[in-house]
Amino acid sequence: MKVVAFERSLQGTGASRRLRNSGKTPGIVYGAGAETQLVELDHNALWHALKKEVFHSSILDLEVAGKSQQVLLRDVQYHPFRQLVLHVDFQRVDAKKKLHTKVPLHFMNQESNPAVKLSSAVISHVINEIEIECLPSALPEFLEVDLATIEAGHSVHAKDIKLPAGVSLVAHVEAENPVVAAATIPAGAIAEGDAAAAGEGETPAA
């Protein structure tokens, strides 16, 4: 995904305020052994880009002054109550070094799960993104979590996710192996099932 930014020379609270008033958003580009670069982006274009999942989880081609560099979006600061992006941070990517980043999880086959269809189970998505490490060339836009066979009372953990070649969970996620999704039967559904079973077991009065 291509992103266009422009060099900026002024920094500080006053300069950033004037920039925002003119429809621009200040940002920085850092990392990969190069100097930190001050940039500005068109606010409306940035606002719409931030609505796309791919903008948050993919390597971006950032063009500044006619030169392109590969970056990851690392931080976004929003105004607390206005639809306004205050600042963005981009980190340069080194093609030869593994990067640590979070990618979104896409949950698949939930509607066709037998526990959902036959037992009224509810599948909760406990986390919606997970931290991985890989070379930039292997970075996936998202990871799929297959919920087709999860049974009521059971969970899917981080280590159950099928990872593409060259991708691994970061060390602390590997060690903790957190729950990603869990299937439970609501108390109301259990009570209804017990009541139905009790009704079936009653002997009709003579």
Swiss-Prot record:
GO annotations of cellular component type: cytosolic large ribosomal subunit
GO process annotations (BP): translation
Assigned keywords, A-Z: Ribonucleoprotein, Ribosomal protein, RNA-binding, rRNA-binding
Pfam family, one: Ribosomal_L25p
CDD domains: Ribosomal_L25_TL5_CTC (cd00495)
Record GO terms (molecular function): 5S rRNA binding; structural constituent of ribosome
Known partners and oligomeric status: Part of the 50S ribosomal subunit; part of the 5S rRNA/L5/L18/L25 subcomplex. Contacts the 5S rRNA. Binds to the 5S rRNA independently of L5 and L18.
Functional note: This is one of the proteins that binds to the 5S RNA in the ribosome where it forms part of the central protuberance.
Family: Belongs to the bacterial ribosomal protein bL25 family. CTC subfamily.
Name of the protein: Large ribosomal subunit protein bL25
Gene name in the database record: rplY
